[in-house]
A protein has these predicted regions:
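Active-site nucleotide-donor binding segment shared across nucleotidyl transfer reactions
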Residues: 18-60
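N-terminal, Lys/Arg- and Ser/Thr-rich interaction peptides
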Residues: 1-5, 32
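A short acidic-to-branched-hydrophobic micro-motif
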Residues: 102-109
Length: 109
Protein backbone atom coordinates (compact mmCIF):
# COMPACT_ATOMS: atom_id res chain seq x y z
CA UNK A 1 0.00 0.00 0.00
CA UNK A 2 1.44 3.37 -1.01
CA UNK A 3 -0.14 6.76 -0.55
CA UNK A 4 -1.17 8.49 -3.76
CA UNK A 5 1.56 10.69 -5.20
CA UNK A 6 4.09 9.46 -2.63
CA UNK A 7 6.91 11.14 -4.54
CA UNK A 8 5.42 14.54 -3.67
CA UNK A 9 5.24 14.00 0.09
CA UNK A 10 7.92 14.30 2.74
CA UNK A 11 9.42 11.39 4.63
CA UNK A 12 7.60 12.49 7.78
CA UNK A 13 4.28 12.51 5.90
CA UNK A 14 4.97 9.01 4.59
CA UNK A 15 5.78 7.77 8.09
CA UNK A 16 2.52 9.29 9.32
CA UNK A 17 0.68 7.33 6.60
CA UNK A 18 2.57 4.12 7.51
CA UNK A 19 1.79 4.62 11.20
CA UNK A 20 -1.94 4.89 10.50
CA UNK A 21 -1.84 1.71 8.39
CA UNK A 22 0.08 -0.20 11.08
CA UNK A 23 -2.26 0.98 13.84
CA UNK A 24 -5.27 -0.16 11.84
CA UNK A 25 -3.80 -3.65 11.30
CA UNK A 26 -2.63 -3.89 14.92
CA UNK A 27 -6.04 -2.99 16.31
CA UNK A 28 -7.69 -5.69 14.19
CA UNK A 29 -5.34 -8.29 15.70
CA UNK A 30 -5.25 -7.35 19.37
CA UNK A 31 -2.36 -4.87 19.59
CA UNK A 32 -1.84 -1.21 20.34
CA UNK A 33 0.98 0.65 18.56
CA UNK A 34 3.00 3.57 19.89
CA UNK A 35 5.78 5.66 18.38
CA UNK A 36 9.06 6.07 20.22
CA UNK A 37 11.24 8.45 18.27
CA UNK A 38 11.15 11.54 16.11
CA UNK A 39 10.11 10.01 12.75
CA UNK A 40 12.94 12.00 11.13
CA UNK A 41 15.15 9.17 9.81
CA UNK A 42 13.17 6.04 10.62
CA UNK A 43 9.87 5.05 12.21
CA UNK A 44 10.36 3.39 15.60
CA UNK A 45 7.24 1.51 16.67
CA UNK A 46 6.33 -0.49 19.75
CA UNK A 47 3.43 -2.94 19.45
CA UNK A 48 1.85 -4.12 22.69
CA UNK A 49 -0.61 -7.02 22.88
CA UNK A 50 -3.86 -5.65 24.22
CA UNK A 51 -6.12 -8.71 24.37
CA UNK A 52 -5.54 -12.27 25.56
CA UNK A 53 -5.92 -13.72 22.04
CA UNK A 54 -3.59 -11.34 20.19
CA UNK A 55 -1.85 -12.90 17.19
CA UNK A 56 1.78 -14.03 17.39
CA UNK A 57 4.28 -11.14 17.17
CA UNK A 58 5.91 -12.43 13.97
CA UNK A 59 2.48 -12.74 12.34
CA UNK A 60 1.82 -9.09 13.18
CA UNK A 61 5.21 -8.08 11.75
CA UNK A 62 4.42 -9.99 8.55
CA UNK A 63 1.05 -8.22 8.26
CA UNK A 64 2.81 -4.84 8.56
CA UNK A 65 5.31 -5.96 5.91
CA UNK A 66 2.50 -6.94 3.54
CA UNK A 67 0.31 -3.84 3.98
CA UNK A 68 3.28 -1.51 3.44
CA UNK A 69 4.83 -3.46 0.56
CA UNK A 70 8.07 -3.57 2.51
CA UNK A 71 11.07 -5.87 2.34
CA UNK A 72 12.54 -8.05 5.08
CA UNK A 73 15.94 -7.14 6.43
CA UNK A 74 18.70 -9.78 6.56
CA UNK A 75 17.81 -10.79 10.15
CA UNK A 76 14.04 -11.19 9.59
CA UNK A 77 14.06 -14.97 10.05
CA UNK A 78 16.42 -14.81 13.03
CA UNK A 79 14.88 -14.21 16.44
CA UNK A 80 16.37 -10.87 17.50
CA UNK A 81 15.47 -9.66 20.97
CA UNK A 82 15.97 -6.36 22.76
CA UNK A 83 17.73 -6.10 26.11
CA UNK A 84 14.39 -6.72 27.84
CA UNK A 85 13.42 -9.67 25.65
CA UNK A 86 11.11 -7.96 23.15
CA UNK A 87 11.19 -9.22 19.57
CA UNK A 88 12.65 -6.80 17.01
CA UNK A 89 11.96 -6.54 13.28
CA UNK A 90 13.13 -4.09 10.63
CA UNK A 91 10.92 -3.38 7.62
CA UNK A 92 12.67 -1.77 4.66
CA UNK A 93 10.17 0.43 2.81
CA UNK A 94 10.37 0.35 -1.01
CA UNK A 95 10.61 4.09 -1.54
CA UNK A 96 13.43 6.53 -2.11
CA UNK A 97 13.11 10.11 -1.01
CA UNK A 98 15.07 13.09 -2.33
CA UNK A 99 17.74 12.94 0.32
CA UNK A 100 18.73 9.47 -0.92
CA UNK A 101 18.00 7.36 2.14
CA UNK A 102 15.72 4.35 2.14
CA UNK A 103 13.00 4.67 4.79
CA UNK A 104 12.48 1.84 7.26
CA UNK A 105 10.51 0.83 10.33
CA UNK A 106 12.09 -0.55 13.49
CA UNK A 107 9.35 -2.59 15.14
CA UNK A 108 9.57 -3.87 18.71
CA UNK A 109 6.93 -6.29 19.99
Amino acid sequence: MKPKNYKTITLEEYYDFALKACRHIALEHGYAVAVHGTMKTDLDLVAVPWVSKAIHPKTLANKFLKILGGEKNALWDTEVRSVHGHLKYTIILPLDFEYGKTPYIDLTI
